[in-house]
């Protein structure tokens, strides 16, 4: 199908009305809108990672409550809704208040209030933000004769940067708590209140008085309220898949598999349909390229800092983690573990749930996130991630994929001898993690500290019909590493794998901070 016959992908467009009127591709989520606004609670909160469709959902609610029935022609809600009542809508976008101090935050909130005060009026004596919010809600109700809808998108945006700062967090949190406080007192005047964010509302303690919010984030009926399911993609995006397949010179089936490996895998409850990252998927269709769009759209500096703070190794990220339901609601500002941040930020997702133990299993959702995380962690093991480093890793991949482990190790030896070495290089674990990161970047199966009946293998990697059993030594010899493999009979652990087992003993030169020598036995 020719490109001009397809609807445009709405890259960066988060306004429902603009998408519909501009004839952009829209994945119909209006059934969830109907379910939510006719549900048991008039106060709802949704947590999802960044760029996952929260703002578009909020905008959809805005159009619905504004009574813009024409925009919903042909969508699920058109058949479900029998009454299209127009309500006054107060829509606040807190993403405008990132990286701010107290004065700037108050100024931004005042600016957003003033826009609606021009419509409904402002009492002269009202100076405080909460008084102005209260007055605004009551005036809108009085002037229209209808209850008011309040939509707050990315409510936690002003606080994310200062989450663990003892000085700034309480100050900004008090401003936000004050701004949101009228939502409970004004309950008789409110038809619906909807808030979105990344962190759970209970974690920031700014809704301590508003205890009637329904958190729909992990409820099964709303599992696919944001993101794109496999069914939605294959029913509504077949032409885009076929065009991408032609561009990538792959079959449709191969393209579907690549899309699944790279962008799928999210679950926000269990059981749940597989959910694709909408930002990455739409960008892939718009550009006809399978690139890392979501990870590249935001540098996870804060995440990397927290991983270091909690001493989380790359290999621990590569394996699954387990968590109780309460762990998802642990106070973020007093975080004692990395699980809440990894999950809410979209770097980990739910992969399984044991109902008896009430235990969730979490893991990296897909290939894009795995590669992105490892690339972000690499500078911590190579001092800096240079262009030469990227080239070397690519050449190593080609060598190993071609069965030339010796050539790959020579490339790594040469590269490590030319870069500034990091701290903490005088222990085997540093190089073990370095190998883990590099092999993970290849998209290959890799694990460290693999248990066997007689010990633990430093590194195990599987590629191209071969399974590499790798032992690392520091300041000794490659022969000593190989002797250790043979003494512990590591290959026997993998004898039933059906793969050719290759033993690799590697010694690192302590003074030169690179590979000293190695022995390979097939």
Predicted regions span which residues?
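Conserved catalytic cores of phosphodiester-cleaving nucleases, focusing on short active-site segments
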Residues: 435, 459-474, 488
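Metal-dependent nuclease catalytic cores in nucleic-acid-processing enzymes
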Residues: 179-186, 340-348, 436-440, 484-504
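Domain-level recognition of nuclease-like catalytic cores that cleave nucleotide substrates
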Residues: 493, 499-522
